[in-house]
Amino acid sequence: MTGREGGKKKPLKQPKKDGKEMDEEDMAFKQKQKEQQKAMEAAKQKAAKGGPLVTGGIKKSGKK
């Protein structure tokens, strides 16, 4: 094998795979993810309008 014959055997870009084939487990997982995302968004909105949870008052230095 000479130097010119060597090289990459695989093409740089792989053909795209069809991701449209999903079974029941995949569908259930996607649905669960959507529900968790909605719950997270609702929790973010609820937390954003609340304000600070705990105020420690005036912070004091360690010196006495």
From Swiss-Prot:
Source domain of life: Eukaryota
Annotated keywords: Coiled coil
Skewed-composition ranges (Basic and acidic residues): 27-44
Region named Disordered: 1-64
Entry coiled-coil feature ranges: 21-50
Keyword Lyase among record annotations: no
Similarity remark: Belongs to the TMA7 family.
Name of the protein described by the UniProt record: Translation machinery-associated protein 7 homolog
Organism from which the protein derives: Aedes aegypti (Yellowfever mosquito)
